[in-house]
Amino acid sequence: MLRVGDIVRVGNDPDERKILSVYKTSDDRVFCGVGGFLRYFESYELSLVRPSTINHPYELGQRVYYKRGQSEDEVVVCGIELQYGYNDTHKVRYNLYHPCTDTVTHMVRQEKLRPLESYTLF
């Protein structure tokens, strides 16, 4: 699966471009936002040139806990975006799907997420 920060080519275009965002739909289709284009591409339209060097602690479709105030909700990562700030530094942000309320929260910082823990009963 393609990830944010991967360097790709679009179709037969020789130019190399960076993936800035990746989204997964409810029917498991993956769309990528590529630098220099004003549209999203399905993953099959892109060919990988170089993999990302960006740390990706969470993946598309992964269930995680999202901390909001005093409570934590179980959510699904449905989008990952690269956000650029001052001095051209990048930050990874997550879009989260809340299955209980059928809503999406955009641009969540990694610090507000933690993986679901699995327990084994003896």
Where are these regions (language model features)?
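Short beta-strand-centered aromatic/proline hotspots
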Residues: D15-T25, S71-Y84
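Short, solvent-exposed loop/turn segments that connect beta-strands within catalytic domains
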Residues: S26-V30, Q70-D73, G85-K91, C100-T103
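Intrinsically disordered, low-complexity, charged/polar segments
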Residues: G33-P57, K91-F122
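Long, charged, low-complexity intrinsically disordered regions
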Residues: Q62, Y66-K67, L82-Q83, H106-R114
